[in-house]
Design a protein with these regions (language model features):
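An extended, acidic
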Residues: 14, 18, 128, 135-138, ...
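Structural motif
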Residues: 62-63, 80-82, 101, 120-122, ...
């Protein structure tokens, strides 16, 4: 199989394996802690087993990096590395909601491989059958349930007040998230819409479908800007700061960008230098993804103002 065929086939294989377990009680059982520090649920283990079964069945000489297992090599000289989040949106998945996807990205296997090295990416809806994939420099594609290609519908909305958007809160101190995002949420909630999906990959694909105009995760910006608040992040992450990891966005950031969206970190900087095989605290990221650059600029300005309203000291912890 070509790299593109491998990425699409693996995405479908994981999706088909996981789908019968959506919303099932056994999927809710916490079974351990992932290499990233996040909680591992029973449904995550089912998804991880699907990865290995596919690689062994297809006899691939490849490495893969996932949330739960870290880096695993198959074959003497792996030609590429797959960056896989078998379920991005585990919490929605165990509840049986739609906001959960399979994420598979392909990059050449090299030391210090980064987000900018991802060549192919695929996102597959688990509850539904839509697929989103992209090749770097080749545009993005949205494949419907019947196999036909759909047209990307990036929203032209430029006003925050009219922009439907998502933000992330898992293990991020909400008392600070609320202050930093207060201006944005107050503006959008009535005439745009504010949503919480617990899946950045799902949210980024909604830019392509025209259901969202923006997705925001400022957790790591707060962690970096306010070192005095680190203990609060440690408490919420059960001893380790939890945030946006490279595997969360390895495929989705490429797909959204190739579709024409504007995707940066929450400072407005490129994410291309993010190391793909590193879940350490220094490699945690933030994100601001929007359907157009004008909205991106306005949201970034509002984020700067919101972060400026925060005064986090050790007494705030």
């Amino acid at each position: 199989m070509t790299p593109q065929e491998t990425v699409l086939a693996l995405t479908r294989h994981i999706r088909d394996t996981v789908r019968p377990h959506l919303g099932a009680w056994h999927g809710r059982q916490i079974s351990g802690t992932a290499a990233s520090g996040d909680a591992t649920f029973g449904i995550d283990e089912i998804a991880e087993e699907a990865i290995v079964s596919f690689i062994e069945r297809e006899k691939l000489s490849i490495a893969y990096y996932s949330e739960d297992k870290g880096l695993i090599e198959f074959g003497a000289a792996p030609e590429a590395v797959l960056i896989i989040d078998p379920i991005d949106g585990t919490r929605p998945a165990i509840a049986g909601f739609e906001a959960c996807v399979v994420s598979v990205a392909w990059a050449d296997y090299a030391p210090d491989v980064t987000l900018g090295d991802v060549r192919f990416g695929c996102i597959g809806e688990i509850k539904n059958d839509d697929l989103f994939w992209a090749a770097r420099g080749g545009g993005a594609h949205w494949i419907g349930p019947n196999g036909g290609e759909k047209i990307a519908r990036l929203l032209p909305i430029q006003e925050i007040a009219k922009a439907p958007l998502t933000f992330e809160v898992v293990a991020r101190p909400f008392e600070w998230i609320g202050v930093a995002l207060g201006e944005i949420i107050d503006a959008s909630s009535m005439t745009g819409g504010c949503f919480l999906f617990n899946s950045t990959a799902f949210s980024l694909t909604r830019l392509m479908t025209g259901q969202l105009a923006a997705t925001i995760d400022i957790g790591n910006r707060l962690l970096r800007d306010f070192p005095a608040g680190r203990e609060r992040f440690l408490a919420l992450g059960f001893g380790r700061p939890i945030g946006l990891f490279a595997y969360d966005i390895a495929a989705a950031a490429l797909i959204a960008s190739e579709a024409g969206a504007t995707v940066t970190d929450a400072y407005g900087n490129s994410l291309d230098g993010t190391r793909l095989l590193d879940t350490g605290e220094p490699n945690l990221q933030s994100i601001l993804g929007t359907s157009n650059p004008v909205l991106h600029e306005k949201l970034l300005e509002a984020l700067d103002r919101g972060v400026g309203r925060l005064h986090i000291t050790e007494e705030n912890e």
